[in-house]
Design a protein with these regions (language model features):
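Membrane-interfacial helix-loop-helix connectors in multipass membrane proteins
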Residues: 59-63, 67, 129-150, 175, ...
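Junction motif at the cytosolic side of a transmembrane helix
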Residues: 133, 219-236
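Hydrophobic alpha-helical transmembrane segments of multi-pass membrane transport/permease proteins
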Residues: 39-61, 73-77, 180-191, 217-225
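Aromatic- and glycine-rich beta-strand/loop motifs that create alpha-glucan
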Residues: 15-44
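A structural motif at transmembrane helix-loop-helix junctions in multipass membrane proteins
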Residues: 150-182, 234-236
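Transmembrane helix boundary and interhelical loop/hinge segments in multi-pass membrane proteins
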Residues: 35, 81-99
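Selective transmembrane-helix segments that form parts of the transport pathway or gating/packing helices
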Residues: 105-132
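Long, hydrophobic alpha-helical segments
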Residues: 70-85
């Protein structure tokens, strides 16, 4: 029996402890190379971001602080849907069978979560830059808002990546994404807007550490659910 066949047989059973940093790094490198070669996807998202921000500028000019904050997170949400939700939907059946034979499900899902988190950190930074250039800079604490935007982008990417993994197994993935995503995304988006308000003034917001801890705890829960549930989806 060849080494490839032995590896395939070892990886097929459901395993919750088979986490390999080397395999995760290899899969992450694969996603980065594909993104680099298919640059039309990345630049398509950039065009969407730039056009959305420019339309907001033409419509509203320089909005007030709360409106600026809300528009930023709503824009980031739709960018995340376009950038992250396709991560599993673009994988064909043949490619998924190939991955099924050579890697464990935990390594596969973790590589997707890491890649999408890095992608959304980049998009969060670009979104913030465009908003500050076109819609003004109402921020009092720019670095704080930048950190929160990266954390928020990662949080949104984790949820949508997990939902995309579930929806990819359904016959109507877009409908499944909408049905499952609405009750999860809306509370998270409202929480991000509330946390980000502190970056617009010098007033200390009560309970801010608890809100950030709640957001981080939600992210950890999503990672844990992906770690536990994705192997069963993978086997199916």
């Amino acid at each position: 029996m060849s080494l490839d066949a032995e590896s395939a047989q070892q990886n097929k059973p459901i395993s919750f402890m088979n986490v390999s940093l080397k395999n995760i790094a290899t899969l992450l490198k694969k996603d980065l190379l594909l993104e680099w070669r298919q640059q039309y996807t990345f630049f398509g998202i950039l065009i969407y971001l730039a056009s959305t921000t420019f339309v907001i500028y033409l419509t509203m000019g320089l909005p007030e602080d709360k409106v600026w904050n809300g528009l930023y997170w709503i824009t980031l949400l739709f960018i995340c849907i376009n950038a992250v939700a396709r991560s599993f939907l673009q994988e064909g059946r043949g490619r998924m069978l190939y991955f099924y034979a050579i890697v464990s499900p935990v390594n596969f899902i973790f590589s997707k979560l890491i890649f999408n988190s890095l992608l959304m950190c980049t998009m969060s930074a670009l979104s913030l830059m465009l908003f500050m250039v076109l819609l003004g800079n109402p921020l009092t604490h720019i670095l704080l808002f930048f950190g929160l935007s990266c954390l928020g982008g990662m949080s949104l990417s984790l949820v949508l990546s997990f939902l995309a993994a579930i929806a990819a197994k359904a016959q109507q993935p877009s409908a499944i994404m909408a049905i499952l995503g609405f009750p999860l995304i809306i509370p998270q988006l409202l929480l991000l807007m509330k946390i980000a308000n502190i970056a617009f003034s010098d007033i200390v917001q009560n309970g801010l550490p608890q809100l950030v801890g709640l957001l981080v705890g939600f992210d950890i829960m999503i990672i844990a659910l992906a770690y536990i549930l994705f192997p069963f989806l993978w086997k199916d």
